[in-house]
Amino acid sequence: MIERGKFRSLTLINWNGFFARTFDLDELVTTLSGGNGAGKSTTMAAFVTALIPDLTLLHFRNTTEAGATSGSRDKGLHGKLKAGVCYSMLDTINSRHQRVVVGVRLQQVAGRDRKVDIKPFAIQGLPMSVQPTQLVTETLNERQARVLSLAELKDKLDEMEGVQFKQFNSITDYHSLMFDLGIIARRLRSASDRSKFYRLIEASLYGGISSAITRSLRDYLLPENSGVRKAFQDMEAALRENRLTLEAIRVTQSDRDLFKHLISEATDYVAADYMRHANERRVHLDQALAFRRELYTSRKQLAAEQYKHVDMARELGEHNGAEGSLEADYQAASDHLNLVQTALRQQEKIERYEADLEELQIRLEEQNEVVAEAAEMQDENEARAEAAELEVDELKSQLADYQQALDVQQTRAIQYNQAISALSRAKELCHLPDLTPESAAEWLDTFQAKEQEATEKLLSLEQKMSVAQTAHSQFEQAYQLVAAINGPLARSEAWDVARELLRDGVNQRHLAEQVQPLRMRLSELEQRLREQQEAERLLAEFCKRQGKNFDIDELEALHQELEARIASLSDSVSSASEQRMALRQEQEQLQSRIQHLMRRAPVWLAAQNSLNQLSEQCGEEFTSSQEVTEYLQQLLEREREAIVERDEVGARKNAVDEEIERLSQPGGAEDQRLNALAERFGGVLLSEIYDDVSLEDAPYFSALYGPSRHAIVVPDLSQIAEQLEGLTDCPEDLYLIEGDPQSFDDSVFSVDELEKAVVVKIADRQWRYSRFPSLPIFGRAARENRIESLHAEREVLSERFATLSFDVQKTQRLHQAFSRFIGSHLSVAFEDDPEAEIRRLNGRRVELERALATHESDNQQQRLQFEQAKEGVSALNRLLPRLNLLADETLADRVDEIQERLDEAQEAARFVQQYGNQLAKLEPVVSVLQSDPEQFEQLKEDYAWSQQMQRDARQQAFALAEVVERRAHFSYSDSAEMLSGNSDLNEKLRQRLEQAEAERTRAREALRSHAAQLSQYSQVLASLKSSYDTKKELLNDLQRELQDIGVRADSGAEERARQRRDELHAQLSNNRSRRNQLEKALTFCEAEMENLTRKLRKLERDYHEMREQVVTAKAGWCAVMRMVKDNGVERRLHRRELAYLSADELRSMSDKALGALRLAVADNEHLRDVLRLSEDPKRPERKIQFFVAVYQHLRERIRQDIIRTDDPVEAIEQMEIELSRLTEELTSREQKLAISSRSVANIIRKTIQREQNRIRMLNQGLQSVSFGQVNSVRLNVNVRETHATLLDVLSEQQEQHQDLFNSNRLTFSEALAKLYQRLNPQIDMGQRTPQTIGEELLDYRNYLEMEVEVNRGSDGWLRAESGALSTGEAIGTGMSILVMVVQSWEDEARRLRGKDISPCRLLFLDEAARLDARSIATLFELCERLQMQLIIAAPENISPEKGTTYKLVRKVFQNTEHVHVVGLRGFAPQLPETLPGTQTEDTPSEAS
């Protein structure tokens, strides 16, 4: 018996609490006991990690996380490791006694994600003496050790002889090694397998019934029947391939038009490009010649434009220069006109102001006289008023003093003081210091006499003053007039200067009278001078335009000559238009005819091509439409004969095929129903029994059995008698023979053998004579021989049928071609060649174009000459009337002479205009200038002094009179005399006072009224003086401005200046207009030159490019033509009808064909590449290569042994026959490969029965398992009702659903899925395809339902669910299920693994304290019976008497955490023996 492999130990290196710890594992149960956090789960996690190093699956959670879908970020592994390199290693011994150490190197990855890096490895050939901890650690001293890295471990193991170290990059390779060496029970090929294994371990670890496993027990317990599935898949693949081949043949048969389409599109694609290049080459040659002609024409035009530009530029320069001088002259004329207008306005102002000044001067003189008289009267009134005032004051003083003296005694003293005061004033005024009251009277007379004398002297001086003042005024007036005319001068010179001025004034007045005649004469001469200058300019311009200088005498003769030339050129131009119209009309007619022929030419060419093809196909030459219709009648007769012969051959071929099919039935049964009846009756066909008879014996046995050679041999006829009742589905004659099929012989008949015949004695009264058949078919050898001869005959018939079919098709195609020709081309095929007519008309068109170009050139020259002559006549028409002006050479001198005289006259006119009035005034008073009244000033001084003396004498006389009057105050009389005397005096004084006051009032009134009048007179005088001075000043300013202007302001000056300005403006406008015309013409000429230059450059570039293109295309075209001729495709590519299409139409035709070709050759890499290369427009030869490649490809696609023509289209038609034969063969092959639905159902039923038996065997091992109230555990396997119905229909009712299984569009899997949907319409299939559903239905596991049942207490058999069981019962039941799964995996894997290996069995159980002692004992018993290892963990020792128990205690020593481990073996009668190496604590050492 093969010994089962075992796990020897688990080693943890640098885990949390375990620096270097090796746990020796018991052969049955290893218990880990300890409190919470002691390290039990860490130890199991290390074991699981080494077993399944897949981070996507590992998730170590505590019991509070049970069933959680997510835990901590590191899935519980990162926190169980320490920093640095960590190891988890499993030491195993397999069935071959090979020691294998498998494990993983773990290392924390720095970062927030708390990731762990895992590297699996395996060690083989390690000696038993070497411990795992010695491999991965290096001892530094007694208390220090270092963990080796994986590379160091590899180097260390490489030094050990016979030890193999393997590091794995994939988990699949790691598990593959473990499976091959017997460490795990199942080959884990994929992540799905690893997930199942991990879920099993996880379910074992955490205990209970795992819903993840119970829901998918079929995947865990039932092995995949891959052989059956692969057989189905291979069969379906063969059928699919066969159907695809058939479909491809059908597509090929239906793609005959596609191949024709490929040839047609390839021809269109290449021929269109070929003809386009041919057309372009011809067009490029024509364009190159046209470019060259246009280049020469443009050069001539550019030269003419350049000459024209130089002439216009020169004329424009002259006009620009003339414009500057004209603008200056025009501006000067405008300024002169403005000055003249200004001078005229100034002159008008001066005249107006002079008239105003004369009037003001008269008024001023009159007002001076009035003011002088008023002033004298004012002086008199002032003196009179002053005297009256003094007299009143004196009288008032006297009267007041007298009143005061009368009133009081003191009045005398006041009067005396007043008398003394009056005496003092008199002394002062009269300059008499010795004056006394007594002498006052004498002095009064003296001073009154002096006053009288002064008054008389004043009156005398006043009379003299009046006379002198008149003479002085006349002299000053005359002097001012002379000074105004001549300027400042001495008074003594005034007389002489005045006489000279009067004489000069007479002369100036005479000259001024000549201004107007001179001005009119000058204006006339200037007008003639300007006309002369204009005529000279016109003559110069005419000579310049004519390019020749002409004398004045030659102009009239030239005028007549130009008019004659105009008349002759006009006739030529008018006749040229008619000639040009006739040429153009003929050209248009030719063009229209050519266009009509070009439209007709493609139709004619297509008809000719069709006619040539018909001639080639039938080998006849046709010259008329009647011959074509006659030949068509012959074709119809030939076609009918060929069809009759083809149908006869086809009927014979079908008969041979039916015979071959009948002879090809398995077992020699010619009727399929015989096989079904033989199976039904439990017998064997007689033909099967004699299937191995030799070919030589076949005639004998065929004659021996005769009609009964298709009998069924059954063991007992009596047993099938009942089955014969009501039998209808059978041949008309059914022979049944009783006998043992294994030892059957021919002893049932009595037979006599004759020559090539036998006599069979069926009964005493019935014999049968049968001759040996010439073609026996009894026995496999005879049938095969007959089938072989039939196949040979069938090949001959097929070939003949194909030939006849091809001939018929060829005749039909030819008939169709004739019909198409008659319908489309017969009306034009036998007409004249339009291309020859086009060539003739093109020659005539070229001649017309050349004649038209010559005519246009001549006509243009005549038009130019005509325009030049008309322009010359127009210029002469303006010049001839001015010939007399051109001949007048003294005109300019006369103008200068008159201009000088006019200047003198205008100067005199200005003098007369300025000083004429002064001279007129001076003439009557010039005589007063002879004597100068110089004494007038002295007289005025004497008069003023006399007036002052008279005023002083009057005051002195008045003062002395007052003293005399107060003389009484100096001595008083007595009171009475004083009163009487005073009374008289008072009365007198009062009367005198009244008279004096009245006089004073009158004097005041007169003075006041005369003062107001004097003030009024003075204001008027001041106003007149101010106005006079202002206007005088303005007049002086105007005269100065007029002198500054320097222009003669006469009556005709403005008209002449305006006329001159207008003439210059007209000249300037004409000059500018001509300049603008020249500038526009010059701009147009420059633009034309620039356009011509650009055009010339473009033409040169285009010509060179076109020439290079022509040269390059010539080389490429030669290569294309050489390739075309070498491959013999010129006839197919040179399609003349395409020559009449435009390049765009040909390019469009080629592009459309290219698009169709891309689709057509998409599946052919070679043609696709050649087509892609042919798309290069610069390499036209590649299109030829593609065309040749298409024809070569079509030739290669057709079998060479049946090709009878070089035309691939005809060869494709011949291939139709071969494809038809292949279709028939593949159809028969598909019938042979067809899957029987009944056989499928039988296979699935047998597989289900086998697996049900295997599950029953597994249940026998679980009958004695009990946990708590659970007495037994079993697996219940049932077939689903829907799938059972499907199997029944497949077995018994398949005929009802043959529409699915006989469909060529559905595979068997798809048909099966459709049948399932038809039987179960209530089931939603979701998004799955019928193929997927069918493949699932071919898997027997999908037909089964599995569930776990437990026999619990009084409830009997119940479905195992966690809610119906206690925790311990659920753990035990789940463990039982897991043991079944492991055992099932081992059974499934025996055929994959070596027969000499029994894999390790190990499960886990965490928190085992939830089981009672009986359940624990059951587990121990189950492990012992199944040779399974179990690792359990519990807070305390569960069953230390069995297996191996480890006590784990986590301690902290010097801030270092470690786990203290003590291990004990199971109890025995002897004292318990401590396991080696576990008595000391596992004190961790610091890694160096």
Curated annotation (Swiss-Prot):
Keywords: ATP-binding, Cell cycle, Cell division, Chromosome partition, Coiled coil, Cytoplasm, DNA condensation, DNA-binding, Nucleotide-binding
Binding partners and assembly: Homodimerization via its hinge domain. Binds to DNA via its C-terminal region. Interacts, and probably forms a ternary complex, with MukE and MukF via its C-terminal region. The complex formation is stimulated by calcium or magnesium. Interacts with tubulin-related protein FtsZ.
UniProt: ATP binding residues: 34-41
Annotated spans, Disordered: 1049-1074
GO cellular-component term (any): nucleoid
Purpose: Plays a central role in chromosome condensation, segregation and cell cycle progression. Functions as a homodimer, which is essential for chromosome partition. Involved in negative DNA supercoiling in vivo, and by this means organize and compact chromosomes. May achieve or facilitate chromosome segregation by condensation DNA from both sides of a centrally located replisome during cell division.
Compositional bias per record (Basic and acidic residues), positions renumbered to this chain: 1051-1065
Gene: mukB
Superkingdom, taxonomy of origin: Bacteria
Annotated protein name in UniProt: Chromosome partition protein MukB
Family: Belongs to the SMC family. MukB subfamily.
Location(s), subcellular: Cytoplasm, Nucleoid
Positions of the UniProt region annotated as Flexible hinge: 666-783
GO MF annotation terms: ATP binding; DNA binding
Organism of origin: Salmonella heidelberg (strain SL476)
Coiled-coil intervals: 326-418, 444-472, 509-602, 835-923, 977-1116, 1209-1265
A biological-process GO annotation: cell division
Domain remark text: The hinge domain, which separates the large intramolecular coiled coil regions, allows the homodimerization, forming a V-shaped homodimer.
